[in-house]
UniProtKB/Swiss-Prot annotation:
One matching Pfam family: Lipoprotein_6
Organism the protein comes from: Borrelia hermsii
Cellular localization per UniProt: Cell outer membrane
Protein name per the record: Variable small protein 3
PROSITE patterns: PROKAR_LIPOPROTEIN
Length: 215
């Protein structure tokens, strides 16, 4: 995505530079289209960069949330020094649950930071808020089950109902985790769509300008 955006910015610069055929005196970061419209390349570049940076930050949060699916595979396991890598160790999942809990706290903190970014659309802020709400719901549910989850000897069954989204019970956090997964998927799509929208707006203006270059 970043390479694509850099290439687009360079293309825009070259095309708009070819449009600078007189007109008002321009600043170093401005170009003029043939119809006299002055374009600020610095603002254009920043708009693309801001959208790209936001999408990249959302992707980081998305990766953290999805990592819990991998962590859940360690329920009832311990490392083994052979090609099998793991062996069973039932009902000792306290540290694993604490680790997942910390991941979601980190997710919540990152979402709070994303909410405070100036310039993102109200739609994206709403999407961020929805993901944050689901992360808080998971934290609240896990805390409410502290009798079963806030100890070293968390049983495999209880651990699964907390962090395994395919578990049949899902009464200790897994149900909230499913909602969080759905919400972060939707936010990532919205963030990527925002980048594509900015790119389409700018490339459309370039395509509209190109025919005049042959006049």
């Amino acid at each position: 995505m970043r390479k694509r955006i850099s290439a687009i910015i360079m293309t825009l610069f070259m095309v708009f530079m070819s449009c600078n055929n007189g007109g008002p005196e321009l600043k170093s970061d401005e170009v003029a289209k043939s119809d006299g419209t002055v374009l600020d390349l610095a603002k254009i570049s920043k708009k693309i960069k801001d959208a790209s940076d936001f999408a990249a930050s959302v992707k980081e949060v998305h990766t953290l949330v999805k990592s819990i699916d991998e962590l859940a595979k360690a329920i009832g396991k311990k490392i083994k020094n052979d090609n099998s890598n793991f062996e069973d160790e039932n009902d000792h999942n306290g540290s694993l649950i604490a680790g997942v809990f910390q991941v979601i706290l980190t997710v919540k903190a990152k979402l709070t930071s994303l909410e405070q970014i100036i310039g993102i659309s109200d739609e994206l802020k709403t999407e961020v808020g929805m993901v944050k709400k689901e992360s808080e719901a998971f934290v609240t549910q896990v805390k409410s089950k502290h009798t079963d989850l806030a100890k070293e000897g968390v049983t495999d069954a209880h651990a699964k109902s907390a962090i395994l989204v395919t578990d049949g019970t899902k009464d200790k956090g897994a149900a909230e985790l499913i909602k969080l997964n759905t919400a972060i998927d939707e936010l990532l799509k919205a963030a990527n769509d925002a980048v594509e929208t900015v790119i389409k707006e700018l490339t459309a203006s370039v395509k509209a300008e190109k025919p005049s270059q042959n006049n």
